[in-house]
Amino acid sequence: MSRQPILDIKGLRTVFRTRAREIVAVNDVDIVVNPGETVALVGESGSGKSVTSLSIMRLLARKVGFIDAGSIILRGKSGQTVDLAAIDEEAMRRIRGNDIGMVFQEPMTSLNPVYTIGDQIGEPLRVHRGTSRREALEAVVELLDRVGIPDARRRAGQYPHELSGGMRQRATIAMALICNPTLLIADEPTTALDVTIQAQILDLMQKLQSESGMGMLFVTHNLGVVAEIAQRVVVMYAGRIVESGPVKEVFRNPRHPYTMGLLRSMPRLGDATEMKRRGEKLNTIPGMVPGLANLPSGCAFAPRCSFAVEACHAAVPPLASVNEHHGSRCIRWQEIAA
């Protein structure tokens, strides 16, 4: 399998225009996804994860959000590369749903309630390949069976409200994969599901990835999911990458205070019961993610950081190399090993 990246983002900067000013939502972001690899994009709400994924898909609100700088190089099924940040909407339409598939967080809002499941999943085949409705239906039934939906032919004729939450999410995964994309973007695909169904969906996505060799960008705030599904992790805060590297290394040896805080905030099996018995509280990161319109000077995390010194407020730190594969945007990364 070629190790040339499927996705290579460099210097991505995404801006939203308001009446008063322009707000930078994603700033100087670099991400690489290789064939067969899952890269997790993590952070609290408001960190810029979803805006990054919407920038890749070019689904930003028109006239409000736009890519201001950087490149998004995609290697499609043909093996040719294209800069998604530079092409027009007509060219992007040929890529969206064909070379790139996307699974959204809430299937009930990403599925159209007035069309059958079969019609919606089959639409990319009809649009991108000119497949007949009958041929598309057969492909849909086969894929629904692969993603674990029983009685697939009958389900293809049903509407979204007739399926359970887990089945709807399986259907959206099928819709994203129907054209065999080289890249799958999954934006919080298990958040709205219970723990049992979540585990099934994660297993399914890993199985389908191993069969196809596609790359996956997995957007989540759940570090437990990251440990299970991803090989590399990119941690975002206030629109910037603050740490990135192999999952095992970053989790065992985080070198940014924000990553350390996220890991310490993870509840572990038995923690809640034992802490309640002792009258203790779960660990949290003090403060809130700052609004992008009013970012603090210097390091955006400094007001919440117990390691902050005066220099942290003076300038935005560069993304320093901990080693060849691990980076941290902290001037004190050498001092804060967990």
Curated annotation (Swiss-Prot):
Q: Which Pfam families match?
A: ABC_tran, oligo_HPY
Q: Where does the record say this protein resides? A: Cell inner membrane
Q: Which residues form a coiled coil?
A: none
UniProtKB keywords: ATP-binding, Cell inner membrane, Cell membrane, Membrane, Nucleotide-binding, Peptide transport, Protein transport, Translocase, Transport
Q: Where is the ABC transporter domain?
A: 10-263
The entry's ATP-binding residues are 43-50
GO molecular function term, any single one: ATP hydrolysis activity
Describe its assembly: The complex is composed of two ATP-binding proteins (BOV_A0347 and BOV_A0348), two transmembrane proteins (BOV_A0350 and BOV_A0351) and a solute-binding protein (BOV_A0352).
Name of the protein described by the UniProt record = Putative peptide import ATP-binding protein BOV_A0348
